[in-house]
Amino acid sequence: MKYLIIIFFILTNTNFSYSAQKDKAYFAGGCFWCVEESFEKLNGVEEVISGYSGGITENPTYKEVTYGKTGHFEVVEVIYDKNIISYERLLNNFWVNIDPFDAYGQFCD
């Protein structure tokens, strides 16, 4: 039994220290596939997940969102190692790739 407690303690501490290194940031910059590709190229970015934010329609389709009828925006969730890349660097990547004065088409849209 004491070995199980020791193993549990080691695994629990390892898991906490690993997850403490990771952070999440969300960006909406038009076509999420273009935004996704831009962030995936950065060292320290672990994963980029596309999805939707806001809106009035529950579980909208891509077609519904792109027609502009749902109020949703295409967004990406960026999971990154904050010991390798800073949030500021992620923001710089975002601002370099969008036009903040264009509300309807960003990146390669």
Please provide the spans of the model-predicted regions.
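Flexible coil/turn and secondary-structure edge motifs
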Residues: 16-109
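Bacterial Sec-exported substrate-binding components of ABC uptake systems
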Residues: 2-3, 19
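Sec-dependent N-terminal signal peptides
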Residues: 3-13
